[in-house]
């Protein structure tokens, strides 16, 4: 399969995540990691805050859009370091802590905090973890009437019907073929669940500046 252009080219004139547009933050140039909101504080400010007390950990709930993505089939989606994607029943699995980055209105990228890989979907509807943020890693986030969300590829859809490829997990936690998945199926319904920093403090060390 021919390589796809990185999102820097895909999004054209979008400048940087540091530039706010409404409630969304735009992506930086291709190859650069989007800065976290916590990184906007100066080093002096971070140092003055001292060690990670309970109040600081609680404050992080609102700093990052870090979530667990719970599927109606009973699994949390996780992105493993080897690039594979699968479901786990474990609450607060390190590989199941995901960072949601708003690209534009209704468009998001999803990054595994521990693995550092972006969720991607190829033209066959297969899920994988990508080291680079490409156009295959941009998804349409749709809020459904049953209070769940669906995530569909922004570039891949069926030519005859226009139906998009959906992120989905089977009943055994394995990734489901996105080309065969439909919006009304429970395989495609996900609920973003909050992350408790006290359950996974190692994923917040870079923000709290402690070891």
From Swiss-Prot:
Keyword Signal: no
Keywords: Growth factor, Secreted
Gene Ontology cellular component list: cytoplasm; extracellular region; extracellular space
Tissue spec. comment: Predominantly expressed in the cerebellum.
Superkingdom per UniProt: Eukaryota
GO terms for biological process, alphabetical: cell-cell signaling; fibroblast growth factor receptor signaling pathway; inner ear auditory receptor cell differentiation; negative regulation of neuron apoptotic process; neurogenesis; positive regulation of cell population proliferation; positive regulation of dopaminergic neuron differentiation; positive regulation of ERK1 and ERK2 cascade
Predominant subcellular localization, coarse grouping: secreted
Comp. bias (Basic and acidic residues): 38-48
Region Disordered: start-end pairs: 31-53
Entry GO MF terms: fibroblast growth factor receptor binding; growth factor activity; heparan sulfate proteoglycan binding; receptor-receptor interaction; signaling receptor binding
Pfam families (UniProt xref): FGF
Gene3D superfamilies documented for this protein: 2.80.10.50
PROSITE patterns cross-referenced by the UniProt entry: HBGF_FGF
InterPro entries for this protein: Fibroblast_GF_fam (IPR002209), IL1/FGF (IPR008996)
Subcellular location: Secreted
Subunit structure, interactors included: Homodimer. Interacts with FGFR2 and FGFR4. Affinity between fibroblast growth factors (FGFs) and their receptors is increased by heparan sulfate glycosaminoglycans that function as coreceptors.
Family as reported in the entry's similarity comment: Belongs to the heparin-binding growth factors family.
Job of this protein: Neurotrophic factor that regulates central nervous development and function.
Name the record gives this protein: Fibroblast growth factor 20
Species for this entry: Homo sapiens (Human)
Lineage per the UniProt record: Eukaryota, Metazoa, Chordata, Craniata, Vertebrata
GN (gene name): FGF20
């Amino acid at each position: 399969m021919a390589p796809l252009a990185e999102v820097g080219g895909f999004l054209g004139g979008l400048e940087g995540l540091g530039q706010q547009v409404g409630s969304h933050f735009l992506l930086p140039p291709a190859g650069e990691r989007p800065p976290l909101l916590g990184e906007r504080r100066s080093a002096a400010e971070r140092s003055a805050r001292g060690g990670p007390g309970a109040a600081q950990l609680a404050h992080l709930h609102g700093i990052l859009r870090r979530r667990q993505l719970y599927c109606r089939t009973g699994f949390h989606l996780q992105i493993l370091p080897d690039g594979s994607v699968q479901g786990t029943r474990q609450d607060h699995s390190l590989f199941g802590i995901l960072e949601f980055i708003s690209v534009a209105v209704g468009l998001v990228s999803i990054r595994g905090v521990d693995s550092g890989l972006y969720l991607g979907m190829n033209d066959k509807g297969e899920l994988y973890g990508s080291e680079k943020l490409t156009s295959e890693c941009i998804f349409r986030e749709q809020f459904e009437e049953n209070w769940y969300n669906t995530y569909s590829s922004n570039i891949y859809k069926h030519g005859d019907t226009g139906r998009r490829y959906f992120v989905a997990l089977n009943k055994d936690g394995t990734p489901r073929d996105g080309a065969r998945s439909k919006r009304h199926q429970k395989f495609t319904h996900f609920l973003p669940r909050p992350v408790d920093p006290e359950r996974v403090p190692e994923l917040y060390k870079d923000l709290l500046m402690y070891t």
